[in-house]
């Protein structure tokens, strides 16, 4: 991590086909992460595919003051949450189509996560994108990170679609 922290990430999926629903977990700490179990009470959740919210409680265990970021549209139906929980619905796939030409909203979602939580700095995210991509892919992904960040920043400032 560029911010002096230790991340540990791992997926959890069954013996299913490519594209099937799955969970991924990330632990971040100021010390090396030794715990290797699933996360049952997350501080934050990011829902990349909102169709997973049908028939599955994606918000199960989200902490009292937790934050959820959902790749979706403003008019989507949201579950009832606890008073201090926040949900940001970000049109990440639309941002990605406009910036990189493909509906892969991951970089827009990580920008949104940075703005919603303060856990990551935008400048550091941009540096990571610069190291990971080159050419037009780099330019598009930098723009996607910025737009995801700005979308949530504006929602926090102006009370736009924030539930």
Question: Which sequence ranges carry the predicted segments?
Answer:
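Active-site cofactor/cluster-binding pocket
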Residues: 1-163
């Amino acid at each position: 991590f560029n911010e002096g922290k230790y991340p540990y990430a791992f997926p959890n999926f069954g013996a299913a086909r490519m594209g099937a629903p799955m969970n991924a977990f990330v632990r971040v700490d100021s010390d090396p992460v030794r715990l290797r179990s699933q996360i049952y009470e997350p501080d934050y959740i990011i829902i990349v595919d909102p169709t997973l919210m049908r028939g599955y409680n994606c918000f199960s265990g989200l902490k009292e003051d937790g934050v959820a970021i959902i790749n979706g549209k403003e008019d989507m139906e949201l579950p009832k949450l606890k008073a201090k929980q926040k949900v940001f619905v970000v049109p990440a796939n639309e941002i990605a189509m406009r910036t990189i030409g493909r509906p892969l909203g991951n970089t827009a979602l990580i920008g949104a996560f940075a703005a919603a939580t303060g856990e990551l700095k935008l400048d550091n995210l941009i540096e990571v994108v610069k190291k990971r991509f080159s050419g037009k892919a780099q330019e598009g992904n930098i723009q996607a990170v910025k737009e995801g960040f700005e979308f949530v920043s504006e929602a926090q400032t102006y009370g736009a679609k924030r539930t």
